[in-house]
Amino acid sequence: MGRARSGPKRHVKRLAAPYAWPIPRKEGGKFAPRPYPGPHTMDTSVPLLILVRDMLGYADYAREARKIITRGEIYVDGVVRKEPKFPVGIMDVVEIPRTGDRYRVVMNEHHRLDVVPISEEEARVKVCRIKNKTYVRGGNLQITMHDGKNWLVEIEDPTDPKEDVYSVGDSLVLELPEPDSGESWKVVDHIPFEEGVWVYAMTGRHSGEVGRVVEIQTFEGPQEDLITVENPEGDQFQTTKGRLIAIGKDEPLVTVRKEE
């Protein structure tokens, strides 16, 4: 009789790791670190160790990457993260104050998680997709974002919630705190998902593409809205609403593609 498993797996086989992880499959050992359960899904995030070693190239080996992380040199969304298995995902802002480097985590056109360099000013901006909304005790509205953040909207009159102007699929623009400031993020704007807004494809066949919404097709029943997007070159593609995130009204507010 085999020995019972004592707990969750600590690692994942490289060959079985999510396709989005930009790691060698047949080199560097048999296993890769498994991210802790956290704000992102395993398919749309990587452990911080992989980001530091494989995506940023700050270390050649896992041991070196762990030292960098546990020394408190890596900040995610303005908060220091010292756990090598902390999941870092799409739209997260990564900062290394010692080097002055700043990056945004994205899904590129090859369906791989990637990082794009951003400015000091842009490092204070993050766009989050509204994933869910629920009313909680007291009649207030709780909004859950795609990265696991929760935002409480105070409702003055629960029988007439005029403050609830948000829909699942809309985006919230966050102002992120400076590293070590002790402050928290705050919501500074709302981007309704509607025709004319700029969107970025986070997943799916068109991942990494950016354009404006030109048509929204809605259906009765559980079928998801079908969105037609036109890129800056005038080419169009279609995808479902759940694969897109609105990133700006008149222009994109954040950088999601590397300069060619």
From Swiss-Prot:
Listed GO biological process terms: translation
Domain spans labelled S4 RNA-binding: 46-111
Residues annotated as signal peptide: none
Keyword Ribosomal protein listed: yes
GO MF term list: rRNA binding; structural constituent of ribosome
UniProt keyword terms in alphabetical order: Ribonucleoprotein, Ribosomal protein, RNA-binding, rRNA-binding
Entry GO CC: cytosolic small ribosomal subunit
Alphabetical list of InterPro entries matching this protein: Rib_uL2_dom2, Ribosomal_eS4, Ribosomal_eS4_central_region, Ribosomal_eS4_central_sf, Ribosomal_eS4_KOW, Ribosomal_eS4_N, Ribosomal_eS4_N_CS, S4_RNA-bd
Alphabetical list of Pfam families matching this protein: Ribosomal_S4e, RS4NT, S4
Gene3D superfamilies to which the protein is assigned, alphabetical: 2.30.30.30, 2.40.50.740, RNA-binding S4 domain (3.10.290.10)
The UniProt record lists the keyword Nucleotide-binding: no
SUPFAM superfamilies: Alpha-L RNA-binding motif
Record-stated family: Belongs to the eukaryotic ribosomal protein eS4 family.
NCBIfam families: PRK04313.1
Name of the featured protein: Small ribosomal subunit protein eS4
Taxonomic source organism: Methanopyrus kandleri (strain AV19 / DSM 6324 / JCM 9639 / NBRC 100938)
Lineage of source species: Archaea, Methanobacteriati, Methanobacteriota, Methanomada group, Methanopyri
Gene it is expressed from: rps4e
